[in-house]
A protein has these predicted regions:
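N-terminal export/assembly leaders
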Residues: 17-98, 127-131, 191-197, 230-242
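Short, acidic, small-residue-rich periplasmic hinge/interaction motif at the N-terminus
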Residues: 35-42, 52, 79, 85, ...
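N-terminal periplasmic accessory domains that precede
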Residues: 90-95, 169-177, 185, 216-219, ...
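Short, acidic Ser/Thr/Gly-rich low-complexity loop/linker segments typical of extracellular
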Residues: 125-140
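Short acidic/polar hinge/loop motifs at secondary-structure boundaries
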Residues: 142-144, 216, 222-224, 248-274, ...
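Face-selective signature of the C-terminal outer-membrane beta-barrel domain
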Residues: 370-397, 422-567, 589-590, 594-595, ...
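Outer membrane beta-barrel strand-and-loop segments of large Gram-negative receptors
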Residues: 486-490, 535-537, 626, 632, ...
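Outer-membrane beta-barrel signature, preferentially recognizing the C-terminal barrel domain
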Residues: 530-533, 573-576, 604-658, 674-687, ...
C-alpha cells in the first residue's frame, strides 16, 4: 500500500511538472489567436489581451518545452508588444496605441524568411527616424506609426539596404539582394561597417560578428587603430582615449569586461574630439548599447581563472533591478593573482671622464589583490528627462612584491665590485568616486548636467637592502603617500540653430593633491608637497549637416591656475597660470559605401600630479627616478584625414608637439648617478598612417591592420649619437572563425619592427594569441578559453638613450598564459545610467 501511494504521488508530481511546459508550432498565426488557444487549453495562467489590438501581429515559430510566459515571450519576439506577469495572470498589450500599422514580410533571394532584419520608418521631409522594428522568425514585421507616407529603410548584414517609399501601410513582400564582391575569385559578403563621422569613425557592432566576441574589451581589440594590451587601451597616433558607455565615462577597464558584446549597437572612435572635451583629450571612444526590453531582476556572474606560472582569478557579481521608470545596479568585483618579471638591465654612465657599466639581473615576484564596488541608481521622469547618482569604490589589500638583484659594476673596463640586493615593495591604494547627473530637455534645448567628487590615496613602502664587499652595504627605507581630492561640475546645453546643432557649456574643476616622501637614511631628499589647481573652461561647438556633408567647428577656453607648496611654503617659481584657446574644425562627406573626413585641432597635455612632485625614488645606488616641479604642459597640433569603403578604412595624420614632455635619463650634478624623469624639449613631430581591411569569407572573418609611424626629433642635439628618426611598421591579423552562432574561435598575430619614441628604441616583437568561445542556452551560459603569447615571444625590450647615460632592458613579464572564463546571465539588461561625469581628464592626471 505504501509503495502504491508513493507511486501515485510521483505520477501526480510528474504530471504537474509536465503541465507547466508546452510544445507547439505556429505558422503565420495571429498572436491573438495563439493567445486564445493557450487560454482555452491551459488553466495555469489567465491571459488577458484585446483580440483586435494584437490581430495584426502574426507569428511563425516552434516552441519546445517552454513555460507559458516563456512561450508568449518567444511569440512576441521583437514586436512592440509588452507582457507583464503577476501571480497567475498574464497581460499582453501593444503600448503604442496607433490607428495604423505598417506590415510586411522580409525574404531573401531564395524567398526564405529573413529574421532579425532592421526596418526603419523615416520622414519623407527630412529623413528623420520616426519608428522602427525587427522582423520575426517568419520574416514578418508590424510597426505602429501614425504618419503617412513614409520612407522604409530595410537593412540586414550581408544584403543591400533597401529604401522604399510607402504610401500604404500594406508593404507586402520585400525581397533582399545579397551584397557580393569578388576578391581574386573568392566571393566576399557583408562585414562590420565603417562610417566616417564628425571627428572620427563609427563601427557597427549589432548584427555583425563583433557582437559575438564576448565582452566590450574583446570588441575594442578588433577595431581599426585600437590596441588592447593587458587591458590598457590605446588609439594609434593618439594615445589613451576617454571611454564612454552610453554617455557614462568608464572608470575602470573592468567595466568593458562587464559589458556584453551582443549588447553593443555601435562604437565610435573619435580621433578629433570637439570643444566639449577637455583640451588634454586626443581620442574618445563612445560605446552605444542596444535598447533592451527586459525588466525586473537581472544577474550576471563571471568566474575567471588563469595560469601564467602562477594562478590568478577574479569573481564578479552584478545585480540589476529595472522597471519602466527606475533602475538600481550593484556590481561587486574581487581579484587575486600573482605576477612576476625576469629583468635583465644594463646601463652605462659617462661622467667625469669615467665610463661606468652596470649589469643587473633582477627577478621579481609579487601578488595583487583588489576589490571594487559600484552602486548606481537613476529615475526616468519621462522619455526626455532622467536623474541619477552613482558611487564607486576601488581598493587594494595585501599587495606586495619582492625582487632579488645581483649587480656587476665595471669602471673604465675594470671590475669595480658586485652588489647583492633585495627590494621589498608594499603598495596600497583606495579610491572613492561620487557622481550625480540630470539629463533632459526643456522645449528644444537639451541639458546635460554632471557633478563629481573624487577622493583617492596611494601609498608605497620600499625597503632596499644592498650588500657588497667592495662597495659597502646599504639599507634604504622609502615611504610615500599621496592624497587627492577633486571637485568638478560640467554643464552642456544644445539647441538647434540654422539647421544644425549648437552645443555650449562650461566645466569647472578644483583639485588638491598632497604628497609626502620620506627617506630615513637621506640617500635621496625627503619632501612634502601640496599642489592646488583650478580649471575654469567654457566652450561652444557647432555641427551642421548638408546633404552628404557634415561640418563641425568649435572653440574651448581654459583658465588654469596651479599653486605649488613645499613644506607648506608657496614656491612662486613653479606656480603657473595658463590662459589658452583650443580651436577645432572637422569636415566629413558620406555617400553610399564611401565616406571621408578631415579634422584639425589644437590640444594640450598637462603633466600628471606625480610627475610634478619634488620627490626621488631610490632604485639602486646608480639610478634614481622621480618628479619635476618645473615641468610645463605640451601643446599638440594635429591634422588628420581618413576614408572608408565598406570593410576598408585608412587614415593619415601629422602631429607637431611644442614643449614636448619626454621621459629621459640624465646625470645628476657632480655625481656618478642617473636621474630619470620627464623634461620639456622644444618640439617633437610625427607622421602616421594606418589601413584596415575586414572582408568576410563564409566561416572565416579576418581583419588585417597595418600601421606606419615616424618621429622627427633631433636627439643628437642633446648628446645622443644615434639617428632615432626612423620609421616603425606594425601589423595585426585578427583571424576569426564563426562555426555557428554559439561557437567561435580566434587567432591573433601581431608584431612590429624596431620602434622609436622620443629617446627610447624598442626592439622588434611578435606574439600569437588564441581563443575559443562557446555559449549555451541562448547565451545564458558562456565559456571562453584563451591562450596568450603561445610561443613566449612577447618581451619588454628597449634601449633608452639619455643625456650622459644609456639604459637597456630585456624583461619577460610572464605573458604566456591560459585562462578560462565562465559567465552566467539571467535576464541580462543594459544599464540605463546616463551620467557622463565631470572632470574626467583631471581624474586621469591624479
Amino acid at each position: 500500500m505504501r509503495r502504491t501511494i508513493i507511486a501515485i504521488v510521483c505520477c501526480l508530481t510528474t504530471a504537474m511538472a509536465t503541465a507547466q511546459k508546452i510544445s507547439r508550432e505556429y505558422n503565420n498565426v495571429s498572436i491573438s489567436e495563439a493567445l486564445r488557444q493557450l487560454n482555452e487549453k491551459y488553466d495555469e495562467y489567465t491571459i488577458n489581451f484585446m483580440y483586435n489590438e494584437l490581430e495584426d501581429f502574426r507569428v511563425t515559430t516552434k516552441i519546445r518545452n517552454k513555460s507559458i510566459p516563456e512561450a508568449i515571450q518567444q511569440m512576441i519576439g521583437f514586436y512592440p508588444i509588452h507582457m507583464t506577469v503577476e501571480d497567475y495572470e498574464i497581460t499582453v498589450e501593444c503600448p503604442q496605441k496607433c490607428t495604423q500599422r505598417y506590415k510586411g514580410t522580409i525574404v531573401d533571394e531564395h524567398n526564405q524568411p529573413v529574421p532579425y532584419a532592421n526596418i526603419a520608418l523615416l520622414s519623407t521631409n527630412d529623413s528623420m527616424l520616426i519608428a522602427g522594428g525587427v522582423s520575426n522568425e517568419g520574416g514578418l514585421f508590424v510597426i505602429p506609426c501614425e504618419q503617412n507616407p513614409v520612407i522604409a529603410r530595410v537593412s540586414y548584414v550581408g544584403y543591400k539596404t533597401i529604401m522604399k517609399l510607402c504610401n500604404s501601410t500594406k508593404m507586402g513582400t520585400i525581397r533582399l539582394v545579397p551584397e557580393n564582391h569578388m576578391l581574386k575569385g573568392v566571393v566576399v559578403k557583408g562585414a562590420p561597417q565603417y562610417k566616417m563621422t564628425m571627428g572620427g569613425m563609427e563601427i557597427a557592432v549589432e548584427n555583425t560578428i563583433l557582437a559575438k566576441l564576448g565582452s566590450a574589451i574583446d570588441v575594442l581589440a578588433q577595431l581599426p587603430r585600437v590596441s588592447v594590451e593587458n587591458n590598457v587601451i590605446t588609439v594609434f597616433g593618439k594615445g589613451s582615449p576617454l571611454i564612454y558607455i552610453n554617455n557614462k565615462p568608464m572608470q575602470s577597464s573592468e567595466e568593458l569586461k562587464q559589458l556584453k558584446s551582443d549588447d553593443i549597437k555601435t562604437i565610435e572612435v573619435i580621433t578629433s574630439p570637439g570643444a566639449e572635451y577637455n583640451a588634454e583629450v586626443e581620442a574618445v571612444i563612445r560605446i552605444k548599447t542596444k535598447k533592451r526590453q527586459a525588466t525586473g531582476l537581472s544577474i550576471r556572474n563571471d568566474a575567471y581563472a588563469g595560469y601564467n606560472n602562477w594562478w590568478n582569478a577574479y569573481e564578479e557579481l552584478m545585480l540589476k533591478y529595472q522597471t519602466k521608470k527606475f533602475e538600481i545596479i550593484n556590481d561587486a568585483y574581487v581579484y587575486t593573482g600573482a605576477w612576476g618579471e625576469d629583468n635583465n638591465l644594463e646601463f652605462d654612465i659617462h661622467a667625469k671622464g669615467n665610463e661606468i657599466d652596470v649589469k643587473q639581473r633582477i627577478p621579481i615576484k609579487g601578488r595583487s589583490n583588489s576589490f571594487s564596488e559600484y552602486l548606481a541608481s537613476d529615475y526616468w521622469i519621462n522619455d526626455s528627462n532622467s536623474i541619477g547618482a552613482s558611487y564607486q569604490m576601488n581598493c587594494s589589500f595585501d599587495n606586495y612584491s619582492t625582487g632579488w638583484a645581483r649587480q656587476e659594476i665595471k669602471k673604465n673596463g675594470m671590475m669595480e665590485g658586485t652588489v647583492n640586493a633585495t627590494n621589498d615593495v608594499n603598495p596600497k591604494y583606495e579610491q572613492h568616486a561620487l557622481n550625480t547627473y540630470y539629463q533632459g530637455k526643456i522645449g528644444k534645448m537639451g541639458i546635460d548636467l554632471n557633478g563629481t567628487y573624487f577622493y583617492g590615496t596611494n601609498e608605497r613602502k620600499d625597503l632596499n637592502i644592498e650588500t657588497s664587499n667592495e662597495l659597502g652595504d646599504r639599507t634604504v627605507h622609502s615611504n610615500s603617500k599621496e592624497t587627492s581630492h577633486l571637485y568638478a561640475a560640467k554643464l552642456i546645453l544644445d539647441y538647434p540653430v540654422l539647421g544644425g546643432k549648437m552645443k555650449l557649456g562650461t566645466e569647472l574643476t578644483k583639485t588638491k593633491s598632497h604628497g609626502v616622501f620620506i627617506n630615513e637614511e637621506g640617500f635621496v631628499s625627503s619632501s612634502e608637497t601640496d599642489i592646488k589647481e583650478h580649471n575654469i573652461a567654457g566652450f561652444v561647438q557647432y555641427e551642421l549637416s548638408l546633404n552628404n556633408w557634415m561640418m563641425g567647428a568649435g572653440v574651448r577656453y581654459e583658465d588654469v591656475t596651479r599653486e605649488y607648496y613645499l613644506y607648506g611654503k608657496k614656491q612662486d617659481d613653479v606656480c603657473r597660470k595658463y590662459h589658452n584657446i583650443f580651436p577645432n574644425l572637422s569636415l566629413a562627406w558620406s555617400k553610399g559605401d564611401w565616406s571621408w573626413q578631415l579634422s584639425m585641432n589644437e590640444k594640450m597635455h598637462r603633466p600628471n600630479y606625480r610627475s610634478l612632485r619634488n620627490y626621488m625614488q631610490y632604485d639602486n645606488r646608480y639610478m634614481y627616478e622621480g618628479g619635476n616641479p618645473k615641468l610645463q604642459p605640451e601643446k599638440v597640433y594635429n591634422i588628420e584625414t581618413g576614408a572608408t569603403y565598406r570593410w576598408l578604412s585608412a587614415a593619415v595624420g601629422y602631429t607637431y608637439t611644442k614643449d614636448a614632455m619626454l621621459w629621459v635619463k640624465y646625470l645628476m650634478e657632480n655625481q656618478e648617478v642617473t636621474y630619470t624623469t620627464n623634461l620639456n624639449f622644444d618640439h617633437y613631430q610625427s607622421v602616421y598612417a594606418t589601413i584596415s581591411i575586414s572582408p568576410r569569407f563564409k566561416v572565416y572573418r579576418p581583419t588585417l591592420e597595418i600601421n606606419y609611424d615616424r618621429q622627427k626629433f633631433d636627439a643628437k642635439e642633446y648628446g645622443v649619437d644615434k639617428n632615432l628618426n626612423k620609421p616603425t611598421l606594425g601589423a595585426r591579423l585578427n583571424n576569426k572563425f564563426v562555426f555557428s552562432p554559439s561557437l567561435m574561435a580566434g587567432l591573433i598575430i601581431k608584431g612590429r619592427t624596431r620602434g622609436y619614441n622620443g629617446f627610447v628604441v624598442g626592439r622588434p616583437q611578435v606574439s600569437v594569441d588564441a581563443s575559443v568561445r562557446k555559449s549555451f542556452d541562448k547565451d545564458r551560459w558562456v565559456i571562453t578559453l584563451k591562450a596568450n603569447d603561445i610561443f613566449k615571444t612577447a618581451r619588454e625590450q628597449w634601449t633608452m638613450y639619455g643625456i650622459g647615460a644609456e639604459a637597456t632592458k630585456d624583461c619577460y613579464n610572464y605573458n604566456r598564459s591560459i585562462s578560462l572564463l565562465l559567465t552566467y546571465n539571467f535576464n541580462s539588461t543594459r544599464n540605463k545610467y546616463k551620467g557622463t561625469g565631470a572632470g574626467n581628464e583631471e581624474r586621469r592626471r591624479l
